[in-house]
Amino acid sequence: MFLLILGVFKKDSSKIIHNVSLLVLLATAVITFNETLGVGQVTLFNESIIIDYLSSFMKIITLLSAFIVLSISSSYLKTFKLFKIEYPILILSSVLGMMVMISSNDLIVFYMGLELQSLALYVLATFNRDQLKSSEAGLKYF
């Protein structure tokens, strides 16, 4: 939410938001790793969410993969003039949905994570609005 507000009120902030998103992904991976070392298994919300070693390991893999995707895609986005503030925010929303799905123990929590992830991926599929194939891909994906 902070990144969206920053992008609205500060002009030409796509580079700042991109770097802050990379920092957020790394910080979340470090926090997930540190919190996992001291705790065995934690349940939240009446055992709807379970946090254990396996889920933390999968979250760290997801976070590092998103970090790599954001790092690699910056040059592509700059080349095709698609370097906008929405891209890293959509990636972060998708990663949040993945992390919810990883820790879910109930079907409704899994579905909430799936919807959060898929909504961000719908928008990412149609990110290049000027191309016909991008609009077609988003329509077919939806």
Regions found by a protein language model. Name each.
Residues M1-F142:
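Alpha-helical transmembrane segments of multi-pass membrane proteins predominantly involved
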